[in-house]
From Swiss-Prot:
It comes from Escherichia coli O17:K52:H18 (strain UMN026 / ExPEC). Pfam families: DUF188. Belongs to the UPF0178 family. This is UPF0178 protein YaiI. CDD domains: PIN_YqxD-like.
Amino acid sequence: MTIWVDADACPNVIKEILYRAAERMQLPLVLVANQSLRVPPSRFIRTLRVAAGFDVADNEIVRQCEAGDLVITADIPLAAEAIEKGAAALNPRGERYTPATIRERLTMRDFMDTLRASGIQTGGPDSLSQRDRQAFAAELEKWWLEVQRSRG
């Protein structure tokens, strides 16, 4: 069981939460990025550098993640592919993607892409708030408790 992070777009405050969680849970944490990352020394934390390019990091996460893993990403298509493989997916704002919600999120993403392509300014997400950080930490903990329960 591994926690995979789409690290190029993951906020540093979320990475810090994940570093502490990896130590506490004693789970491998792999940060996948197309640039060098500085991470704390730990036998549980490692980086995986991939070539620069569109979806290269996403494709590597999909290739390596397995059922039971957790993928941290705000990228809806990556989350959908991880869920198809049996992994859990969580965004940095603490929203867990599920098979029931991912289709709706993909549809909304495609709709927003269409609006942007037609020249309509849609704006980006708000900056990460303290509430978002707390929601992320709480959902990560909830996932971990579910994992422990399923192990019996």
